[in-house]
């Protein structure tokens, strides 16, 4: 459009909208969406239903421990079954409450109890603040509100390992024994985890009461992931938009990473977004490969964002060396730039030995490559290179107040001194 021409935004939006012929309903591919059917999880659905069905006869069901690797459908399946149970129970006039708690966010004894009490706040008018009360008092309140009437309360503790690692198993001890202290209501707990090691942190009594029943979620194989994606794709994309190889490729890439359905769905969604943005009429395998790259890069950015400050300064030293044309560098060369940066920031530098450990950590995270090479009679040394572009790293650091002051410094030619 020439300078003098008027920009008609309404027309522009309409034109852009018309060009969007890829997604019929993208929401279907989001993590929060619960599909109407869960292919390849019928066995687990039935196992959970068998354990929970006593509720419909007024009997207390066992506590359940659900485990399996990430993206194997644990959360979606438990939510699906408990919500169905809630619906069916209405027919039998048996009140069922399902309380879902994500322990990655709600990760202390106190907050778990407070969340349970507050779940009933519309009914009871009681709301516990998220800090401040003595824990015993919150627990007493919890018993009081739950026991106000005859009902079944199913407490789902997702990512239960995070809770136990952060705050111990005291809250599980109380909740799995609470029925002996209630007169009207009955409670059962469903714990979900993708980390089996956390069981070692549990008191054996807690372990045996939590694991009265166990339901295992095995990883999906590529064919199963294909079915899951095909079902979602029917609702998410316009007909004929996906090239034949797209779903099998997404499924194969995700199967390689321990059969993670979340990863498979992400690949399909991002491939569609890339195709849409470039105005393509079809999603092709090329888009899937680019989606894979983008997801990996985004993950890398997240990892860099959450590094401790010392590792960020170290990484920035490597960025400066790269921009100065000085990579590969050895540990000593990186260390001397790192020390100067610490001085610039007024930060106490770590020893070279410790920095060598942090270099290994960055290598393990895939951010840098630190290859050990032999220098003949001079012994062995590391050759350090960057695996992420300096541009990407600078972009992440731009929003980081602690490291921001460094972004304007650069190295002085061969001397590797700060400018
Ligand atoms: N059998 C299935 N059919 C359809 N969608 C599925 C199926 N299994 C998993 N999904 C989808 O994959 C994504 C991940 O599933 P979910 O969150 O239940 O995994 P998870 O096992 O709880 O993982 P994590 O341990 O990481 O929390 C969700 O978007 C979910 O809807």
Curated annotation (Swiss-Prot):
Protein name per Swiss-Prot or TrEMBL: ORC1-type DNA replication protein
**Known NCBIfam families for this protein?**
orc1/cdc6 family replication initiation protein, PRK00411.1-3
Membership in a protein family: Belongs to the CDC6/cdc18 family.
GO MF term set: ATP binding; ATP hydrolysis activity; DNA binding
PANTHER family named among the record's database cross-references: CELL DIVISION CONTROL PROTEIN 6-RELATED, ORC1-TYPE DNA REPLICATION PROTEIN
Q: Which gene encodes it?
A: cdc6
Instruction: Give the matching InterPro entries.
Output: AAA+_ATPase, AAA_22, Cdc6_C, Cdc6_lid, ORC1/CDC6, Orc1/Cdc6_arc, P-loop_NTPase, WH-like_DNA-bd_sf
Entry keyword annotation includes Transmembrane: no
Q: Where does ATP bind?
A: 72-76, 220, 232
Q: Which GO terms describe its biological process?
A: DNA replication
Q: Sum up the protein's function in the record's words.
A: Involved in regulation of DNA replication. Binds specifically to the oriC region.
Keywords annotated in UniProt:
ATP-binding, DNA replication, DNA-binding, Nucleotide-binding
Q: Which residues form a coiled coil?
A: none
